[in-house]
Amino acid sequence: MKRIIICLLGAVSGLVAVPAAAQQSSMQFGGLMFSHDLMLAEDFASLSRPANFGTARAMALGGAFTSLGADMSAMSINPAGLGMYRRSEISLTPMLSVAQGETANTLPWQGNNRTRFSFANVGAALNIFESSSGSLVSMTLGVGLNRVADFNTRYSYSSESVYDAASGQTVPTLADVFSQQLTYHGIFPNQDGALGYDYVPYFWPAILGYNGFMTSQAGDQMVPDMIGHNASAIYSVDVVNSGSINEFQIALGANINNILYVGATLGIQSVHKKTGITYQEQYLYDGAPVDRDGTPLASKLDYASLYQQTVLDGSGLNFKIGAIVRPVAGLRLGVAYHTPTFYSLDRTYAADIESSISNAANTSREINTDRTPVLSDDGPNSWEFVSPSRLLFGASYTFGTFAIVSVDYERDWYNGIRVKNVPDGQPGFIIQPEEYKLEFKNNFCATNAVRAGLELKPLPVLALRVGGGYTSSMLKDKSLYFNRPVATESHYLTAGVGFTLSRTTVLDLAYQYAVDSYSKYQLFFSMDADAGQPVTWSGLYDTSITRHYIALTLGFRF
């Protein structure tokens, strides 16, 4: 099957940022503005990062629930915890999320906040078997829906590069890199000056740049001839992510002699992620705009605004097994294994541009727009991959009815991610599964996560909780990944309170403060790979995301 482009151009395929197999020289092009027509290794890894969601009690305890149970979150963490239920329960957990983006040494542009309401968990645990004789004490069937990832973020900023008249060095622009890319690959307009989208989608942003007057043909090369040699540039970026991964779960837990608890969960995931990236360059002058020779420009480009959008939809399937043992009163030891999740993902990509041209005297202005076709990877031609496997260990101790201390350790093997299917494309213009495998083995590593929680019950009807967690980076060397921000380390702190409203009703409240660090990234760059030297580059940007979650669980036991 071919990748489907919704237009009359026919079916063509995507191109990676470094199509060395198709080129004789060694120029590379990349950064945040490139390679959104396909999925990079870091995209698969980012989809595989789990979040600490569940019931408010589990969230308040930092997610340290591998050795605990009698909670709906057990289906997501260690299904053996279902075996600790003595009664049936139904609960629902609405959640409010607020994400705030911050990029160091920049000014705010459009906005940095995303606020969303969702359900962190909805579930039912049904006690389907109970016996006062024999080794099997009880069995509990669990059915639930749990949020496992939240993609709702936004970061937006502006920065400026000022022309230095003393050195005469032009400021770097995306228009420069588009010009170099089109020239290097021999992509030029036809004799009528038209340049359409009958090229692989990797080139579409640069072709938009031509149609938006960011670059023009001058002999055997493309040049940004409507941007003055003496221009300063303001770079503005707005990245908006939305969507989530939710997992429908069917689980079974068993209690054996009130000492050993075992369980298993079948997880079916639903994936939706939409990303919109707006990048704008505005060109400013201290005086009249001139070309390299000092000749005034008759017309100049005031700004160009490029928008790229990807939409990802799909499903995943996994299996979880676990056990908890109570060797002595008060002590619980738990272990759980999560198989890799097999994902099948449909994906679309499209882009558009708006630019403004004015004459040197600023007495007339023209607004230009253009858009690409829609690239669609779906059906048999979708993306398929398996996420890391996960191994969890937990220990907890209960001090009578007064307190619980719980600690978890988790190891996730990101170097074990494997891509199983990619859209069928033009040879040399799409990454093959074997190439992804090599990258994951060489550049990614297993992560180590530690979680801890403490619960105090000063009164039989009141519980106070605190917790926290830390996860190490999935990258062996984060400096190698500068095409886009890749989540590295993360940490969070949690707190909560629980109320026993009656014998059958409980109410829990939790707050979580989480910070994700990301690799530094370029907005755009071109590089001579053989020489190992950059040609044009934006400089590195450093973005972090802070999240606030408030969850409320209402549970009914019967």
What are the residue ranges of the model-derived segments?
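Outer-membrane beta-barrel translocator/receptor signature
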Residues: 56, 68-77, 82-162, 246
